[in-house]
Amino acid sequence: MFDVRVINKRENKNWSLKKICYQLFLATLCPFLLSCNNDQETKHIKPEYWSTSWATSLKVATPGFDPPVPKIKNTTIRQTIKLSGGGEEIRVWFSNEFGTVPLKVAGATVSRGLGRGSIEKASLRKLFFEKKGSATVLPGERIASDPLKFPVQNLSELVISIYLPGDLSGSSSPISYHVRGLQTNYLAPGKQVESADLKNAVTSVSYFFLAALDVKSQDKRPVIAAVGDSIMDGDQVADAEPVDENARFNNFLADIIFKNG
């Protein structure tokens, strides 16, 4: 039997978040109008702009508070992200900002997902870094993949797979991650970035070393950054956490903005 009190509490919280999102949407109308006026003056030039469509904050694990970080040694990590705005090209940012040793990325791909860690193989594209298939992220740094022509729609989902050959769990270097991702992501042994289905994978609701994704389009968009506590991640009461539901504050806000033109 469902716990009605929990459901009502969750619905009330979601309704409050939606009210806040509508207020923020009204506040963004002015920048959108100014942007439209500027575009009218130079519409014959058809410029293109990069803007961040997805991003998350990273941290290191807090002993005794955060759950243990999964073992990462010779590991493929497959992570699903929910975009806000779409575009014709993408670039993906990877981070080693809290690490104390270089992070070797020995393969990375982007694709559309089919759920439960599976991907649409026909959509898979390799990511390159200065035209190379691998890269090293220095301690305290971030790197972006080369721009890739990969059209994406507003509010769509993408799957990013990376292969990390090193023994990160066996080193003393902190792992840069976002603990409360509330998205089922997958860690599998060996190099499986191009596999449609992962073998022997374990799951986590965290994001690892993945910092942001930018899109390139002809729209000059303002970017809104949501800063706050775990409510921004979509945290609810423990027995009703919305994993894989995209029920974060910024998801509600993006829905309102893009569905209202």
Regions found by a protein language model. Give the residues of each.
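Bacterial N-terminal signal peptides
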Residues: 23-32
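Bacterial N-terminal signal peptides that target proteins for export
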Residues: 4-24
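Intrinsically disordered, low-complexity serine/threonine-rich segments
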Residues: 5, 19, 35-41
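N-terminal secretory targeting modules
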Residues: 29, 36-227, 232-242, 246, ...
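Signal peptide-proximal N-terminal region
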Residues: 252-261
